[in-house]
Amino acid sequence: MTAATAQRIGQGSRSSKEDRDRRLVRYWLYAVFVVLIAIVMVGGATRMTGSGLSITEWKPIHGVIPPLNHAEWLEEFDKYRQIPQYQQINKGMSLEAFQSIFWWEWAHRMLARFVGFLVAVPLAFFWVTGRLKGGLKYRMLGLLALGGLQGAIGWWMVASGLSELTSVSQYRLAIHLTTACIIITAVFYIARGLVTYSERPAERSIQRFAGWIVFAVLVQIYLGGLVAGLHAGLTYNTWPLMDGAVIPSDLFIQSPWWRNLFENPKTVQFVHRMFAYTVLVLTVLHSLQVWKQVPGTTHARRTIVLVGLVLIQAVIGIATLLMSVPLHLGLTHQFFALIVLAFAVAHWRATKGAYEG
């Protein structure tokens, strides 16, 4: 065997090992992604069932164990009875009814704890065994830090509903939801950067537009968080007009005017609707751009799927509105928003190609 042949075999062996390592890390990130989706969906159910304030303390370690006997349940229920939500809305609630809302919030917090372990433990293993190359180590540390911050934001949100309000602040709810979606975006973006793509990266203009679409979807999710926090989906339950008007007359009844954008349920729903149309227009324009510059490519075909997903999400949103936000449609609307976000992220990453090395 010549030296050149031995060198080629050695390079092939290293390449095969690197491919295996990238695949392992990618599958791990996919698992994290799935659990993050589950957390957001359980969080949505927690919000829609009015369960988010059922646990009035933040116990990152001791909170893992729920009440185990009747006395402990009564103690937990007594804590809930001290807050305004019980006193003003749920007064007279039975212990059984309290238990049903308790389990939603407990499950949400348990999933959040679980994903912390799902990130930290494999991260340590991959780091020690040298499976994380280049900047991947620091990207993953950033995700871990962002996850810790999200836990603090979650308690900050819950705390807003324990003293004076009967529900959590819509500002904090929207921030909590959007931060979760930013983490989902980052995890999926990194995972898709470890894929081997058959097509070369798209031109910079396409990459930038794809990135702006991801940003627009995140903004729309933030606006959806405001809608959820204010129960703004119950204001105008007609479409395409809003109670017979294109632009209702009571959008700016609060002073100063900008407060309406965050605190007036009618204005918040109006903005969420209008921005939904904006996202749809952006995806159509992006598709036209890609088909003009690189027609018939995988990049172009993906944009057709993206437009289709946005259209489906719009239909789900309209149905949710017309039916006054029933639980199943509200959760479907939230889930499909995550599908749109994930596909937009996958498309954006694919236009840039895989990470080098």
UniProtKB/Swiss-Prot annotation:
Disulfide bonds: none annotated. The chain crosses the membrane at residues 24-44, 110-130, 140-160, 175-195, 209-229, 274-294, 303-323, 325-345. GO terms for cellular component: plasma membrane. Keywords: Cell membrane, Heme biosynthesis, Iron, Membrane, Metal-binding, Oxidoreductase, Transmembrane, Transmembrane helix. Its EC number is 1.17.99.9. Its cofactor is heme b. It is a multi-pass membrane protein. Catalyzes the conversion of heme O to heme A by two successive hydroxylations of the methyl group at C8. The first hydroxylation forms heme I, the second hydroxylation results in an unstable dihydroxymethyl group, which spontaneously dehydrates, resulting in the formyl group of heme A. Belongs to the COX15/CtaA family. Type 2 subfamily. HAMAP family: HemeA_synth_type2 (MF_01665). This is Heme A synthase.
